[in-house]
C-alpha cells in the first residue's frame, strides 16, 4: 500500500512537471534588444535620408508604442495619457492571453516604424530574424502569434495618435521661399538645398504647451561692420586653431544626415545618422552600462525620443523666426 502511494505521488509529480514544461516559461529581453530595433530604424533613415526633425518623429512614436505595452504590465510606470498631450488611454486587450509583453513591445515598435518610415517595409527582415531568435529561445508559436496580435492592437492605437499630430498637413502649405533680406537664410552652395521642415512648429508637441514655450534670446544682430559682434564671431573661424582632439570631437558631433561636398568638378553626397539617432545610441550605451531592466530602458528611450521631438519643435520654431543665415553661408561669402 505504501509503495502504491509512493508511485501515485511520483506520477502526480511527473504529470505536473510535464504539463509545466509545455507552458511557456518566461523569456526576458534586455535594453540591447530595444536598441537593436532603433538601430534598424536608423539604418532606414540613412537609406531614406530622413531629415532630423522627421527622424525624431519616427523614433518618438515607435518608442511610445513599445512603452504603451510595457506600461500596461508594470504598475510603476506612469500612463502616457496622463503625460502626453491628447493621448487617449488604452486598456490591455482582454482577447490576448499567452503573450510575451516584452516581445509585444518590440513588435509594436517595429510595426509602428514599418507604417511611418518611407522604407519601413524593409523592417520585416529584422522582424523575421527577431521571431526566429525567439523560437530558438523556446517561445511557442502560440506565444509568438498572441504577441504579434497584441503589438498590432497597440501600434494601430499609436498610429492613429500620430496621424492627428498635424504633420500630414505640412505638404499642403506653400513652399518656403527666402525673403532676400541681408543676414537671412538662403540656400547654401554647392547643393542649394531647400529649407528643412519650415512648418515643423505646427506639429502637435508631446509635452509642451506651445512651440514657443521656451523661446530663446534672439541671436546676435547681423552686420558686416568690422566692429560688430557678428563680424567678430565670424572671424573666430579664421583665428581659432583646433587641436586634433577638438577636430575629432567636432567630427563626432557632425550629424548632418546628407552633406554635399564639392571635390573639384564632382559633388559628393555623404549620408550619416541624424542628431536624434546619435542621442538614441548614447541612451543605449547608458542603459547598457548601468544594467537597466528592459522596462526601465523602454521608459528611458521613450523619454529621450519624446524630448527630442519636442526639442526639434522648439528649435525649428526659433530657427524660422530668427531666420538667420547659416554660418557656412556667412563664411563662404
PLM ranges: what are they?
Residues 2-10:
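Sec-dependent signal peptide recognition
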Residues 15-18:
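C-terminal motif of bacterial Sec signal peptides marking the signal peptidase cleavage site
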Residues 20-333:
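Acidic/polar surface patches and capping/hinge elements
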